[in-house]
Amino acid sequence: MLLDDLYEIVEPITADLGYILWGIEVVGSGKLTIRIFIDHENGVSVDDCQIVSKEISAVFDVEDPVSGKYILEVSSPGMNRQIFNIIQAQALVGFNVKAVTLAPVGSQTKFKGVLERVEGNNVILNLEDGKEISFDFDELKKLRVSPDFS
């Protein structure tokens, strides 16, 4: 699978450069956009993104993991970071999040609340209306931090 191949190539590069690979997202059809999100204990600057992008591009030129043309984007995950795995979810307990499910739960696919806790592969949200809901992480299309600026 393309995403697995990309993680296998990119993870050692980011680690060797001293960064944490936060996640990879592949979007589009035809000409793909490969988004690589990096983090660092001291934050991530534009220069950091350029350094990582240059290294990854050089390896992609040799390994050629993507057939055809693509756009490579390297950035910080930002304040409203996507949560790519259950370990990241565990570290973000207490944060406001937005969840989008793969299939409707009742009649809705979008939920907003506080990431209350993680139990095994389940994330439990305390919704804005005070109700609690649990999702298997694999049933989520997207889970993203949703900063509260009020």
Swiss-Prot record:
- Coiled-coil positions: none
Q: Name one GO cellular component term.
A: cytosol
Which Pfam families does this UniProt record tie to the protein?
DUF150_C (PF17384), RimP_N (PF02576)
State its role. Answer: Required for maturation of 30S ribosomal subunits.
Please give the SUPFAM superfamilies that the UniProt record associates with this protein.
YhbC-like, C-terminal domain, YhbC-like, N-terminal domain
Name it.
Ribosome maturation factor RimP
- Gene name, per UniProt, is rimP
Q: Where in the cell is it found?
A: Cytoplasm
